[in-house]
UniProtKB/Swiss-Prot annotation:
Protein name: L-lactate oxidase
Disruption phenotype: Deletion of this gene does not affect growth in nitrate-containing medium under normal photorespiratory conditions. However, the mutant is unable to grow diazotrophically, caused by its inability to protect nitrogenase from O2 inhibition.
Species: Nostoc sp. (strain PCC 7120 / SAG 25.82 / UTEX 2576)
UniProt binding sites for pyruvate: 28, 137, 172, 263, 266
Active site positions, chain numbering: 263 (proton acceptor)
Reactions that this protein is recorded to catalyse: (S)-lactate + O2 = pyruvate + H2O2; glyoxylate + O2 + H2O = oxalate + H2O2 + H(+)
Pfam families with a match to the protein in the record: FMN_dh
PANTHER family: 2-HYDROXYACID OXIDASE 1 (PTHR10578:SF107), S -2-HYDROXY-ACID OXIDASE-RELATED (PTHR10578)
Domain of life according to the entry: Bacteria
Role this protein plays: Catalyzes the oxidation of (S)-lactate (L-lactate) to pyruvate, with a reduction of O2 to H2O2. In extant N2-fixing cyanobacteria such as Nostoc, this enzyme primarily serves as an O2-scavenging enzyme, protecting nitrogenase that is extremely sensitive to O2, and is therefore an essential partner in N2 fixation. Also shows clear oxidase activity with glyoxylate in vitro, and low activity with glycerate, hydroxypyruvate and glycolate.
Length: 365
């Protein structure tokens, strides 16, 4: 295979990133749970759906702008929450945040970030407007959750994105085989500043990561959402919904947006692909909350397919990590710009100049 020095698509970024990352880090980022069936399906479903272009439409001016929860975006994508970004580059989440903000798009920061939520917010504050959400869990230690929410609100995050598909960690066999640990010098930056945490001593692994895994709460129910919403006025986004009845219930319990997601295929192997779940969820929500989607986005045409079925925007994950590994902020910026260019070209070729006009008539399902 010819060596790739300047990637021209997201798949080439993945190939090049492998040469920049340790095997343990690459496997952590790329792997799914179990046999990785859901991981593969997230991509395969986009390849199965074909497009039906319209001809002789004026596409001389393509408009990619949209909004999510009233916050403007220059294109319909956000950076998905991803842990441990300093595994890919020393600037980690700071580089990602700078790239997202400079492109006029949004970023969802993971609780398990290796740069603190305050540091990342400061980067975003240099751009106006800047869309940053904070991803979190409701931990067994409610004091930990409360502290994170209060810090996110004080730092200026625009929404709380609650991950609901992780009552326990999925069976990620590559990580087990590699005995995955955080390298020396990397920390869960959002937890190191919280006093009073009972961090276990775990030889050969990160005590903080062990503590976090123990804090996942399999006893959570819908009723716990009321407590979370009482902590701040920030809108609540639920990430990890795959059923229409759950989506309808999310709206009843106050969610302002839903991210249709199977955690990148990293939780329940054999779960439905995100795009396959999207139509039922859009119908169930019926315009009462905004619907977003993550999982499998690699091309501008993929974004069109998700929007046609009813997503307001999409989130991209692993390709951002590949860009980060290859070139830091510049690499992430290039990944975003590649998708933006592909989306712009695809919009012209399907005969549609406005995102709001994309619908299922453009799809061959």
């Amino acid at each position: 295979m010819t060596a790739i020095s300047s990637p021209i698509n997201l798949f080439e970024y993945e190939q090049l990133a492998k040469t920049h990352l340790s095997q343990m880090a690459f496997d952590y980022y790329i792997s799914g749970a179990g046999d990785e069936i859901t991981l593969q399906e997230n991509r395969a479903v986009f390849e199965r759906i074909k497009l039906r272009p319209r001809m002789l439409v004026d596409v001389s001016q393509i408009n990619l702008t949209t909004s999510v929860l009233g916050q403007p975006l220059q294109l319909p994508l956000l950076i998905a929450p991803m842990a441990f970004q300093c595994l890919a580059h020393t600037e980690g989440e700071l580089a990602t945040a700078m790239a997202a903000a400079s492109a006029g798009t949004g970023m969802v920061l993971s609780t398990l970030s290796t740069k603190s939520l305050e540091e990342v917010a400061e980067v975003g504050s240099k751009f106006s407007p800047s869309l940053q959400w904070f991803q979190l869990y409701i931990h067994k230690d409610r004091g930990l959750t409360r502290a994170l929410v209060e810090r996110a609100y004080a730092a200026g995050y625009k929404a709380l994105c609650l991950t609901v598909d992780a009552p326990v960690l999925g069976q990620r066999e590559r990580d087990r085989r590699n005995e995955f640990v955080l390298p020396p010098g990397l920390h869960l930056a959002n937890l190191t500043t919280i006093s009073g945490l009972n961090i276990p001593h775990a030889p050969g692994e990160s005590g903080l990561f062990t503590y976090f895994a123990q804090q996942l709460n399999p006893a959570l129910t819908w009723d716990d959402l009321e407590w979370l919403q009482s902590l701040s006025p920030l809108p609540l986004v639920l990430k990890g919904i795959l059923r229409g009845d759950d989506a309808a219930r999310a709206v009843e319990y106050g969610a302002k947006a839903i991210v249709v997601s199977n955690h990148g295929g990293r939780q329940l192997d054999g779960a439905i692909a995100s795009l396959d779940a999207l139509p039922e969820i859009v119908a169930a929500v019926n315009g009462k909350a905004e619907v977003l989607l993550d999982g499998g986005i690699r091309r501008g045409t993929d974004i069109i397919k998700a929007l046609a079925i009813g997503a307001q925007a999409v989130l991209i994950g692993r390709p951002v990590l590949w860009g980060l590994a290859v070139g830091g902020q510049a690499g992430v910026s290039h990944v975003i710009s590649l998708l933006q260019k592909e989306l712009n070209v695809a919009m012209a070729l399907i005969g549609c100049s406005q995102l709001q006009d994309i619908d299922t008539s453009f799809l061959h399902l």
